[in-house]
UniProtKB/Swiss-Prot annotation:
Matches recorded under Pfam families: Dak2
Domain DhaL: start-end pairs: 1-82
Species whose genome carries this gene: Glycine max
Alphabetized UniProt keyword annotations: Kinase, Transferase
Protein name: Putative 3,4-dihydroxy-2-butanone kinase
Family that this chain belongs to: Belongs to the dihydroxyacetone kinase (DAK) family.
Superkingdom of the source species: Eukaryota
Gene Ontology molecular function: glycerone kinase activity
Biological processes per GO annotation: glycerol metabolic process
Protein EC: 2.7.1.-
Amino acid sequence: SDAAETVGEIGSSIGRSMGGTSGIIYTIFFKAAHSVLKASSHSGVTSKQWAEALAASIAAVSKYGGASAGYRTLLDALIPAS
């Protein structure tokens, strides 16, 4: 879908231009969302699919970054939104 490709391109752009740990974390976040959205066969993305993409992104950042709720990281802002 267009949404999946846009999210994937955001992740690629961040990976090319943003250095340090933040760049890696944001790249992981957007690439995980891209994977979930791309799996959708619909031309439009539903709110449920956006929520699933956010949950997958949070899980990926937690997995690769080693943080979880309460660690005072980006995840503390994202988890309540999911």
